[in-house]
């Protein structure tokens, strides 16, 4: 099979969507399929092509203010490329309705007979005031192009509910997987709480720090390790200094180093207001690291052991008390069951890529 993926960005950028696309694309190549990726890159003036682990990648010039939107430049040339190249593919799999590059590509291909799959990675709205205003307008355009897709794939039950509510569609739900070797990694807890991902205000890392402070006051002495980049990083550092806990604030790690840190975390916390799924939670679950998440999106993990689901409306002190009890209980529970990426690829072929 010949497949084209459209993604906001691609490796070596290490965002959540890009990680998912890379995980699927490279496994398809290993199974003998031909895979190309069309993605955006904001610091170039003309398209670039390269091959990464046998996946052919075309990086298209985009505007990405605030590391968002991914608005394609040279749109006439992009349109010609898409219309010409789809003649050579069996399936095009587009990722993220929050990316203009993705929706522009889908609109360009709306009348083409190629099998089209869309994974929206949808979380309902934008993360800032301006982005929320923009999303109200953008949503109307997204609604129009969704009618031209053969299969809409949701990564979680919560995302599926949002898509049904906002667009009146019922997507196929297939959750993300993890690398097979991660399933063999043992949990060896140390004395820290961990967060890894984008450092944005809506991720509520500052609240996680407050919770660690309350745990320390309760006699549970843990530090906080934060890995990532984002526009809230400087403000977060000031808040961490003010809170007065022991912490480390580091840039994103290599994947193996990230997993090494994760396997030694006493607790992984993701208190984000909005997530389509939460891949870091998936990886923590696969290792057996106790995790705290929040409603509503955290309900994706309601059937999993060693997972505490709480509400952002609770005070940080209340959440700390929940965690104190949870950490004792989690040690007695079995490790959660998590799919591998190879199992997920099997489901993609069976459900998403079959005409």
Model-based region annotation:
Residues 4, 153, 184-213, 225:
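Conserved donor-binding/catalytic core segment of Leloir-type glycosyltransferases
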Residues 41, 158, 177:
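Carbohydrate-associated surface elements
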Residues 45, 91-113, 117-125:
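An aromatic- and histidine-rich active-site surface loop
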Residues 135-152:
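Membrane-proximal helix-turn-helix segments that form the acceptor-binding/catalytic region
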Residues 183, 314, 318, 328-355:
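A charged, aromatic-enriched C-terminal amphipathic alpha-helix characteristic of glycosyltransferases
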Residues 235-253, 309:
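Nucleotide-activated donor-binding/catalytic signature segment of Leloir-type glycosyltransferases, i.e.
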Residues 273:
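Aromatic "clamp/platform" in nucleotide-sugar-dependent glycosyltransferases that forms part
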